[in-house]
Amino acid sequence: MLQNIRIVLVETSHTGNMGSVARAMKTMGLTNLWLVNPLVKPDSQAIALAAGASDVIGNAHIVDTLDEALAGCSLVVGTSARSRTLPWPMLDPRECGLKSVAEAANTPVALVFGRERVGLTNEELQKCHYHVAIAANPEYSSLNLAMAVQVIAYEVRMAWLATQENGEQVEHEETPYPLVDDLERFYGHLEQTLLATGFIRENHPGQVMNKLRRLFTRARPESQELNILRGILASIEQQNKGNKA
C-alpha cells in the first residue's frame, strides 16, 4: 500500500536534496519518488547523500510536468504556508498521513513538495485537494526540503503502522472519488461552457475559475456526482447550440 504514495518534487535545483529526500523516504518505508522538471539530474552527490537509498533515486520517475506526476491519483496534497490569496482546505501533517494511508489502499496518492526557495506556485497548489502546513517555530520556520519530506513521511508511516497494529484489514475497492485526470477534464469542460454562455470572457476569467476550483475541491464530488455535473454541462452546451441555430 505504501508504494501507492508518491513523493513529488517540483523543479528541484540541488541534487543533494534529491538524495536527502530519498533517504528520508526510505527510512519511513516510502520508495515512490517523482521528479517534475528537475533543474539538475540526479548525480553522484545525490547517490552519496541518499546513504543507502540509492535505489529510490535510481527508480525515480522523471517527468516534464506536474500533471504527468499526478496522473492516476485520486488524492493530491501540496505543501504550503497558510497565507495564500485564495484560501484552500488545510491539513496538518497528522491528518495528511491519515488521509493518505486511507486513500492509498485503493488508488495512488501524491504528496507534492515545491522548489527549495519559492515552493509551489498558486496554479500548482490549485491542482491539490488539500494543502498541508507544518507547524514549525514561527520565529524560525525554515525547513529544508528533506526535513519537510521527513515530517510528512513520518506521519504517513505512523498512520500505516496504526492500521497494522490494530489488525485493520484495508479493503481494496474501487475508490468513489474521480482521478485527477477526470477532474482536470471537468474543469476544462466547465470553463469552455462558461465561455460559450458568456459567463466568463476569454483570456479574462479573473478569479471565477479559481473560486470554482476551490468550491469543488472543498465539496470533493464522487465519480458519479462528477458524471452528473458533466451531463449538466453537456445539456447546457446542447441548449446553447440550439438557441444559436
UniProtKB/Swiss-Prot annotation:
TM region(s), chain numbering: none
InterPro entries per UniProt: Alpha/beta_knot_MTases, RNA_MeTrfase_TrmJ/LasT, SpoU_MeTrfase, tRNA_m1G_MTases_N
Main location: cytoplasm
Record's keyword terms, sorted: Cytoplasm, Methyltransferase, S-adenosyl-L-methionine, Transferase, tRNA processing
GO molecular function, one term: RNA binding
Residues that coordinate or bind S-adenosyl-L-methionine: T79, S80, A81, G114, I134, S141, S142, L143
Entry GO terms, CC: cytosol
Pfam families given in the database record: SpoU_methylase
GO biological process: tRNA nucleoside ribose methylation
Protein name according to UniProt: tRNA (cytidine/uridine-2'-O-)-methyltransferase TrmJ
